[in-house]
Amino acid sequence: MMKEMRKKPHVLIVEARFYEKISDALLKGAVSALQKAEASYDTITVPGALEIPAAIAFAEQNKISYDGYVALGCVIRGETYHFEIVANDSCRALMDLTVHKRLAIGNGILTVENEEQAWERAKQDDKNKGGFAAEAALCMIALKKRFGDNR
């Protein structure tokens, strides 16, 4: 079906699996929000948060056309500077895709101090950041269409 004929958004969820159980919780929230909106979706996985922007860029070049993207993952501070690199660079790369490629992306990459904070944000019955990221993507898809980018 051609994208222009679709009434409901078609979304790609890109899920980093570095913290698998936390990622599973984020995914449940995102899927629930997309199903509630009657959006169709595909899901792919990548090793970690740094790979999410590249996966979205690859998908954008694919024959399958997505209206928007949901980025899901978790970065927990450790003892080295690696946390700052992953947190900052994954977010910056997503913003670059959003601004320069005009992609509708909901950012659900958690950047937290510890696993307890991650669970608080990942669980559907708590902060539900996976669901929030999906809702943000849907909002940006609608905004993009409002301004005439029906690509």
Curated annotation (Swiss-Prot):
Binding site for 5-amino-6-(D-ribitylamino)uracil: 18, 49-51, 74-76, 107
Catalysed reaction equations from the record: (2S)-2-hydroxy-3-oxobutyl phosphate + 5-amino-6-(D-ribitylamino)uracil = 6,7-dimethyl-8-(1-D-ribityl)lumazine + phosphate + 2 H2O + H(+)
Residues bound to (2S)-2-hydroxy-3-oxobutyl phosphate: 79-80, 121
Pathway the protein takes part in: Cofactor biosynthesis; riboflavin biosynthesis; riboflavin from 2-hydroxy-3-oxobutyl phosphate and 5-amino-6-(D-ribitylamino)uracil: step 1/2
Active site: 82 (proton donor)
Alphabetical list of InterPro entries matching this protein: LS (IPR034964), LS/RS (IPR002180), LS/RS_sf (IPR036467)
UniProt keyword terms in alphabetical order: Riboflavin biosynthesis, Transferase
GO biological process assignments: riboflavin biosynthetic process
GO annotations of cellular component type: cytosol; riboflavin synthase complex
EC number annotated for this UniProt entry: 2.5.1.78
GO molecular function, one term: 6,7-dimethyl-8-ribityllumazine synthase activity
Enzyme class: transferase
Function summary: Catalyzes the formation of 6,7-dimethyl-8-ribityllumazine by condensation of 5-amino-6-(D-ribitylamino)uracil with 3,4-dihydroxy-2-butanone 4-phosphate. This is the penultimate step in the biosynthesis of riboflavin.
Family indicated by similarity: Belongs to the DMRL synthase family.
Name used for this protein in its record: 6,7-dimethyl-8-ribityllumazine synthase
The species this protein was found in: Bartonella tribocorum (strain CIP 105476 / IBS 506)
Gene name linked to the record: ribH
